[in-house]
Amino acid sequence: CAAVERLALMEKVEGDDIFLLKTAALYHDAGFVHQYSSNEEIGAALAKEVLPRFGYTDEQIEVIHQLINATKVPQSPKNKLEEIICDADLDYLGGDEFHIIADKLKRELMERNMVQTDKQWDELQIKFLEQHRYFTKTAIELRRDNKKARIEEIKARLKTYKD
């Protein structure tokens, strides 16, 4: 939620739009409670169910629904707010907390038998990092160099594995 607010402010987004972005950020991973993959639709449905009780309008809920669904990978945002939530969702790829979050994700995937080895994990990371792109000018400027450094770091590590 902090990343979405930071990016929104730096992108000159104000008022209700920041409120909607922060709400979408809170709900966008809520579907993980029910299932691991393709959880965005569940989070969006949960938001649709709960938010009317807190005075959200149908129009606001529809925007939140679209924002949540925009975070599905591969991401294809259709407007500025969707670009912001997509960049915030994967902000860590170029952030200082990359190793901490990547390690947690690696453990999740290993527990689900989606990767079995460090080499498989690094190959998956390289593929994801190279296919990913930031959309907002702010995220590109803030995260591009760190993300590039992570790619080079992982590529170097991949060269050390023995097959």
Regions found by a protein language model. Give the residues of each.
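His-Asp-centered metal-binding catalytic motifs of divalent-metal-dependent phosphohydrolases/nucleases
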Residues: 16-34, 43, 64-72
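Divalent metal-dependent phosphate-bond-processing catalytic cores, especially two-metal-ion Mg2+/Mn2+ enzymes
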Residues: 2-15, 27, 56, 73-163
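Charged, amphipathic alpha-helical interaction segments
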Residues: 9, 29-30, 48, 52
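An active-site-proximal "capping" alpha-helix that borders the catalytic cofactor pocket
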Residues: 3-4, 39-54
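Hydrophobic alpha-helical membrane-insertion segments
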Residues: 37-38, 98
